[in-house]
Design a protein with these regions (language model features):
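Bacterial N-terminal signal peptides that target proteins for export
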Residues: 1-5
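Serine-hydrolase catalytic core recognition
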Residues: 58, 223, 246-247, 301-304, ...
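Beta-propeller folds
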Residues: 7-13, 17-446, 451-464, 468-469
C-alpha cells in the first residue's frame, strides 16, 4: 500500500514552521508578492489544465545522451499522454509519437488494467510507457493493447495486432528482440521482422509465465516477471501458480451495470501464489529451474543479471519479511549459493529497496538499514565497507561511475524535509558531496554513461522544474523551467498564494515530529477552521517536505481553511527506530501523534479548537476511522476515503510485514482493526469508496457502514461507480472535492 493521496497534486511536498522555523515570506522580487489577486475556483483546480504547469513524465536520456524523451499531457486533456523528444545539444523539441494518431481506442484487457492500477497510472490514457532500443535509434511504444516501434524521424511501425493485448514489453539488451507477455506466456519477436514465437507455452488458468504476481506488483515494486541476460543468450522467467490463492468475489459496480470478477487475492494469513524461477534460451530450450531453497513459502523479491552475464542475482525474502538472502545463481545449472543475508530485529522487518548495483569487478553497492538508518555499503570478496553513515537516510541510488569511482544517490543528510542529490567515493567512506541547491525537494536519474543527470525539483512556491546537469550537478540547460510567469496556468493565482510554514512537536517518547501548515491571510482576533490531512502509514515517502504541494491546499486556504499535516511515528525516511514503533500495533502511535498535532493546533490563538476536520485516503482513510474511535470530540468531523477497516482483508506482503501472521497473533489484528469500534464513532463521518476498487476492496467500507447502521449510528456515504482505488478523472475529481467540502462546510464551518 504505497501512499494514495486523492486530489490534485496533493503529493507530499511542501512546507511549514511556526514552532521551530519562521514562516517563509515571499521576497519582494518573488512573483508571488507582485501578482494581481485572482481567486482559485473548483473549475480551475480540477479542470483540463494542470495549474502546476506542464509536467513531463517518464523522462529518459537516449543511450548516447543526445536525446531526451518524455511523456507529456496534451494541452486539452491532461490525462492523455504523447511521446516527445528534445535534442540535448540544441534544445529543439518535437512530438515524436501522437497517441491519437496511432491509438485505436480499444478497451484494455483486464490484466493490463490491473497492471496499470498497480503502477498508479490507471487514470492515464494514450502512451503510458516506452522503452529505448539499445542503439537509441528506435523506441518501443505500447498503446491500447498493442505494440509499435517508433524511429527518431517520427515514423511508426505496428508490431502486433491482437485482441488480447501484450504486457511487460521490452527491447532485449542488444536490440535483437522485442519480448512481451500474452495470454500468460512469454513471447519474443525478432526486430528484423521474423515471426513471433512462444518462449513458454504452459501458461493458462492459474499459471502465469513472465508476469509478476499481485503482491510483487502492489507491495514489492516489482513490475515484471522476466529478465534478459546482457548477451541475450538467456532469459530468466518467473512462473507463478495462483491455484492455492483465495478467490475473492469482487463486484465492479459501474454506472450502467455490474461486472463480477473472481480475483485471486492473497489476504493476510492465506496462501500466496507458488513462485518458481527458470532460466532458458530465447527459444524456450535448455530450461533449468533455479534452486530457491526448500521452503517454497518465500517471496521472489528481485532478480538481476551480473554485468557479464555469468550469473544471476536473486533476492529471496522470507514470508515473515525478517530475512533476505542474496543468492548467486549459475545459469547453466540453476544452482544457487548465498552471498550474504540481511536480518531484521525482533520487533522489526526488512524494507525492500532498489538501491543496489552490481559492479564489473564482482562487487556490489547495496543499501542496508543494518545500523538503524538506510545507508550504502560495498560488498566485495565477502567483506563490507560502509560508504555513508549518520542519523539520516539514503533514499535512492541514482548511478554508479565505476571509472571515476563515484556513487550518486539521493538522501536527506542536509535536512530531513529536503531530498538532495549526492555523490560519494566507492572505495571508502567519505563525506558525501551535495550536488543540488538547498531549499528544494529533488529527485534525479542518470544516463548509462554517468555523464548526464536529469534533476527534478520543486519548492513550496515553485511547481516542479526539470533540468539537465553534468555529473558535478551543474545545470547545463532547462528541460522544463516551468517558471510561474505570464502564460503559466498558475500565474493568475500567485497573488493569493500563501507561504507554507514548518515546525516541530515532540511525541510522547520524545521523538521529533515535523509538521507543515498553510493559513489564509490571518485577521487579528479571528479564529479559523482546520483541514487536517494525514496519511500516517509505513513504507512510503514522508508527507512533510519542502516540495510543491499543488494548488488544492492553496484553494482550501482561500476557502478559509488552515491546511495542516504532520508526519507521525511509523512513517518512512526517519530511520528504523522511528518506523518500527507500529510493529504489531497499527493504529496506535500514528493516532497518538496525529492527536498531538491536533492539540498543538488548539493551542494557537488563530485556530477555532472546535472546528478541526480530518481527512485521509487509503491508510489515511483507516486513520480517519481510528482517530474518531479513539478520540471522540477532538475532531469536528472526518472524511475516510477507501479505508482498510479490517487488516485481515488486506494482502499478505503488506499486512504481515507489520502485523505478522493473524493465526499466530490475532490480538494485533483485533487491536488494529477499525471496523470493530465503528459503532462507537460519535462525530460526523463521510465514508468514500470507489465501487470497482481492486486494491482495498469495497467490502472494507460496507463492513463499516453495516456496523454503524446496526447500532443506529449516523454517518454519510459517497460511493463512486466504476472507480478504483484512485477516484478521479474528468468531472469526478471535482465532484469528489465538492462532496468533501460540502460535508465539511455543513459539519465543521457552520457548526455553532
Amino acid at each position: 500500500m504505497r501512499a494514495w493521496l486523492l486530489g490534485l497534486a496533493l503529493a507530499s511536498s511542501g512546507s511549514a514552521a511556526m514552532a521551530a522555523d519562521q514562516a517563509q515570506t515571499p521576497a519582494a522580487s518573488d512573483p508571488v508578492a507582485t501578482a494581481t489577486p485572482t481567486g482559485l475556483t473548483f473549475g480551475a483546480v480540477f479542470g483540463a489544465t494542470d495549474l502546476s504547469g506542464r509536467q513531463p513524465r517518464a523522462l529518459r536520456l537516449s543511450p548516447d545522451g543526445t536525446l531526451l524523451t518524455s511523456l507529456r499531457p496534451r494541452a486539452d486533456d491532461r490525462d492523455r499522454l504523447d511521446l516527445w523528444a528534445q535534442d540535448t545539444r540544441t534544445g529543439d523539441e518535437r512530438m515524436l509519437v501522437d497517441s491519437k494518431a496511432i491509438g485505436s481506442g480499444a478497451e484494455l484487457s483486464e490484466a493490463e488494467k490491473m497492471q496499470r492500477e498497480r503502477a498508479r497510472i490507471g487514470g492515464s490514457r494514450g502512451i503510458v510507457a516506452y522503452d529505448f532500443a539499445p542503439d537509441g535509434r528506435s523506441i518501443l511504444v505500447p498503446i491500447d493493447g498493442d505494440l509499435y516501434l517508433a524511429t527518431l524521424d517520427g515514423k511508426v511501425r505496428r508490431l502486433t495486432d491482437t485482441p488480447g493485448g501484450e504486457l511487460n514489453p521490452v527491447v532485449s539488451p542488444r536490440g535483437g528482440f522485442v519480448s512481451f507477455v500474452r495470454d500468460q506466456n512469454l513471447f519474443v519477436q525478432p526486430l528484423d521482422g521474423g515471426p513471433v514465437r512462444a518462449v513458454t507455452t504452459e501458461g493458462g488458468g492459474t499459471v502465469h509465465f513472465g508476469e509478476a504476481e499481485f503482491v510483487a506488483q502492489e507491495e514489492m515494486d516489482r513490475r515484471t516477471g522476466y529478465w534478459w541476460s546482457p548477451d541475450e543468450r538467456f532469459v530468466a522467467v518467473e512462473r507463478f501458480d495462483e491455484a492455492r490463492v483465495h478467490v475473492a468475489t469482487r463486484a465492479a459496480i459501474g454506472a450502467t451495470g455490474t461486472k463480477v470478477y473472481e480475483q485471486r487475492y492473497p489476504a493476510a494469513g492465506t496462501p500466496n501464489a507458488a513462485v518458481d524461477l527458470y532460466i532458458m534460451k530465447p527459444d524456450g530450450t535448455s530450461r533449468v529451474k533455479v534452486d530457491l531453497g526448500r521452503n517454497a513459502d518465500i517471496y521472489l523479491a528481485r532478480v538481476d543479471w551480473l554485468p557479464d552475464g555469468s550469473g544471476l542475482l536473486v533476492q529471496r525474502q522470507s514470508r515473515d519479511q525478517k530475512r533476505l538472502d542474496m543468492l548467486r545463481v549459475d545459469p547453466a545449472t540453476g544452482k544457487s549459493t548465498i552471498l550474504f543475508t540481511e536480518k531484521a530485529g525482533a520487533r522489526s522487518w526488512l524494507n525492500l529497496s532498489d538501491a543496489y548495483h552490481a559492479l564489473a569487478d564482482g562487487s556490489l553497492i547495496w543499501r542496508s538499514e543494518r545500523d538503524g538508518f538506510g545507508h550504502l555499503y560495498r560488498f566485495a570478496r565477502g567483506r563490507w565497507t560502509q560508504l555513508t553513515k549518520g542519523a539520516w537516510v539514503v533514499t535512492g541510488l541514482v548511478g554508479v561511475d565505476e571509472a571515476k569511482g563515484k556513487v550518486f544517490f539521493t538522501g536527506n543528510q542536509t535536512d530531513v524535509l529536503e531530498q538532495h542529490l549526492y555523490s560519494v567515493d566507492i572505495a571508502r567512506a567519505s563525506a558525501p558531496a551535495r550536488l543540488t541547491e538547498r531549499g528544494w525537494w529533488n529527485s534525479a536519474t542518470m544516463d548509462a554513461s554517468t555523464t548526464r543527470l536529469i534533476v527534478s525539483r520543486s519548492s513550496p512556491n515553485q511547481p516542479t522544474q526539470v533540468y539537465l546537469a553534468d555529473a558535478a550537478g551543474q545545470r547545463l540547460s532547462w528541460i522544463n523551467e516551468n517558471a510561474v510567469a505570464p502564460g503559466h496556468p498558475y500565474q493568475p493565482y500567485l497573488a493569493d498564494h500563501q507561504p507554507t510554514q514548518f515546525g516541530t512537536l515532540k511525541a510522547a517518547d520524545g521523538s521529533t515530529l515535523h509538521w507543515k501548515m498553510i493559513t489564509p491571510p490571518l485577521d487579528p482576533g479571528r479564529k479559523y477552521p482546520v483541514f487536517f490531512q494525514h496519511y500516517g502509514g509505513p513504507g512510503t515517502g514522508q508527507q512533510v517536505t519542502r516540495g510543491w504541494a499543488g494548488p488544492l491546499p492553496q484553494f482550501l486556504a482561500q476557502q478559509g481553511w488552515i491546511w495542516f499535516q504532520i508526519d507521525n511515528r511509523g512513517s518512512y525516511n526517519r530511520g528504523k527506530a522511528f518506523e518500527d514503533q507500529i510493529y504489531h500495533a497499527m493504529g496506535s502511535v500514528e493516532v497518538e501523534d496525529q492527536l498531538a498535532g491536533a492539540n498543538y493546533l488548539k493551542s494557537l490563538a488563530f485556530v477555532e479548537p472546535t472546528k478541526i476536520a480530518t481527512y485521509g485516503w487509503s491508510y489515511g482513510g483507516y486513520m480517519s476511522l481510528k482517530m474518531l474511535e479513539k478520540n471522540p470530540g477532538v475532531y469536528a468531523a472526518a472524511v475516510a476515503g477507501a479505508p482498510v477497516s479490517d487488516w485481515k482483508l488486506y494482502d499478505t506482503h503488506y499486512t504481515e510485514r507489520y502485523l505478522g501472521d493473524p493465526a499466530k497473533d490475532p490480538q494485533s489484528y483485533a487491536g488494529s482493526a477499525a471496523v470493530q469500534d465503528a459503532s462507537a464513532i460519535r462525530d460526523p463521518l463521510l465514508l468514500i469508496h470507489g465501487m470497482a476498487d481492486d486494491n482495498v476492496f469495497l467490502d472494507n467500507s460496507t463492513a463499516v457502514a453495516a456496523k454503524m447502521q446496526a447500532s443506529a449510528t449516523p454517518f454519510e456515504m459517497m460511493f463512486y461507480p466504476g472507480q478504483t482505488h484512485a477516484v478521479g478523472g474528468s468531472g469526478v475529481a471535482e465532484h469528489l472535492w465538492r462532496t468533501i467540502l460540502g460535508f465539511l462546510d455543513r459539519t465543521v464551518k457552520e457548526r455553532k
